[in-house]
């Protein structure tokens, strides 16, 4: 009995130590970044939506023709909400690309969240990446914060995570993004550093690859896709909700999995006149393929900050979809 009591006390102490390893950042940084606390050794964020998040780097070049297989495997294996953020820079002679995968974990304590993260990483390595030969690696906190600044400002600068804990530090993340109307925004108060945010609203069932725009038009693109697969119980709840909403008792969901998706596209140019001319071509391109794309009117700053922060500041607008549509929206 004494031995069991001793083991229980040791376990309780270990749980407390794990939970205490979460370091809360300054209140000013919390407001700017949407992050409440970090676990530096595990590279995990605790965010203002009360979710734990971990970010991974994905090498787009290795994906090649495996996009659909990856998305389908993630939807079949996990029920976490997952966000892919792809940044594409078309400079005319080449297209540069980098990509992140942000995974949401719901848990009451960090001890519970860490177990979920470990289970996720074991599964994705054994059941997905080792089979598809895709390289997905955890992103360190320093690198992640540097990429957040790059996505927002267009300038790469090394970020010292120690700045997050100082109340005297001033972070300007998000301050310089101004709504210019009709989904457009201006960065740093400069009309020559501007962009537009677009929101996906509808997709044809047999939608083709929607990536030729990125190859033809010189610009910087942020492609942001959230998706989540639901289990059998959640699927039935979703079906009943649809029936209630549309007063249709015959709604059936034939897919093995119910998958919801949110799609955002941001296009950034260095010239306001060029952006204006390109805007029509963007909507014409999607309209031609029967994809309903709308400017992010009224939520421009909120959406762009969510995109550039890799989902640390959360914004999404989900609708039913399938893995093929998701995979056809990024390169």
Question: Where are the regions a protein language model picked out?
Answer:
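Extended, folded cores of ATP/NTP-driven motor/assembly subunits in large transport
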Residues: 1-330
